Each structure stands twice: as C-alpha cells, then as structure tokens.
C-alpha cells in the first residue's frame, strides 16, 4: 500500500525524519508512537505532501508520490486528518463534508450556465454521499447545524466524514483520541474498525497507549527522527529500546 525508502526530512541542520524505511500492508491499522519531537508529525506531513522530503522515496501502490502536491496525493486515495480539526465554523456539518469530493462541476462558473442539469445531478449525488458518511460517524442529528457548535470529539468525527466522502484507500489519523471523551472515543474506534473491515488502511499517530495497543497491528516506534522498531503490541512493549526511548518501563 504505502512504502518509504530511506526517507529524510531536514530543517537546517536538524533531521526531523532520519533515514526512515517502512512498508504498510493493505487493510491494516498501523500505529505510530514515540515521544514528543520524535518526528511523527513531520513524517505524516511528508507522506501527505505538506513537506517535500529532503531525500528518499515514498510510494503509494507502487507509484512515486514524494514531492507531489497534497491535492494530487489526495486524488490518488491518501487522506489525512489533523490533531486539531479546523472545520469552517459558519458552514453546516453537511456543507463542510460536501467540500471534500474532487472535480465538482458546480465549482466551474461556466458549467452552471452551460450544463445546469449535470451540475444539479452531481450536487444531489454529493449531498447523498455526504449524508451517508455523516450518518456513519453518528452526526446525522447535527448535519444542518453550524460546525462551530461541535465539541472537540465531534469535530474529529466531522473531519473523518469529510475525508471518507472522497473514498480514500489510506487514511492518516493524527491523534484521533486526543481531547475526546470516552463515549466519543469509543465511537471513533468503532468507525475505524468498521472501515478497516471494508478495506481501508490506516496509519495512526496516538499517545493513548491503551488505544494503540488494543487497536493497532503492527506498531511503529520513532525516536529522534529514526524508526526504532516495528512489531506487535507485545513485541514493542518488551523492546528495551522502546522502553528507554519512550515508555520509561511503564508497560509490563
């Protein structure tokens, strides 16, 4: 699905991502953990196209994507969410989700004049898809409400719905559990599992160790820009390098 080969990203003399190589298999939920400053978010930004790697290769389903713009990577089926979602606050939940699909005819001024029936038909299809995914994440009762009224956890669900409407095959989730109450976190986890069973692959940054250990197979561990190890929850929790670098012996 996704592979990195000797991926490096430098800012001045600092290597935020340092010679990282990995392969994500199809239909897996992979965790990415490490202490603050380990390079996890920079790695995400390289994969999603927000940062161009200084060196190395990224391939999505065999095709090079390193250096591509975020919209081109998104169009190839790779989407990401952010630790702090920022929906358009004065637009409704439905309108926020409707923004995501690419190549909407109604975005072209001339199309509204020359092919209004086609524009209207596509808009109806986009609305139906948006409502489907809003219902999937459990926000149908808020579909017509402005996004500004949503809680932090609800905003994460909105962001998930917004990427799902574009039908990605790989989703990068940046701390989906951060600042989320237990009830909404359970909903988020249930949706991730359901999507994975439908064939969606996930790479997840998360500091909630209980969540990572129970949900993710495998788990990758970064520290100081390097990938220390990849393995099962049991293997990672017993690896002395991981304990020294991040877990501090807290996991038995």
Regions found by a protein language model. Give the residues of each.
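Helix-to-loop junction immediately C-terminal to a conserved catalytic motif
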Residues: 48
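Conserved ABC ATPase signature
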Residues: 146-150
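Conserved catalytic motifs of ABC-family nucleotide-binding domains
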Residues: 167
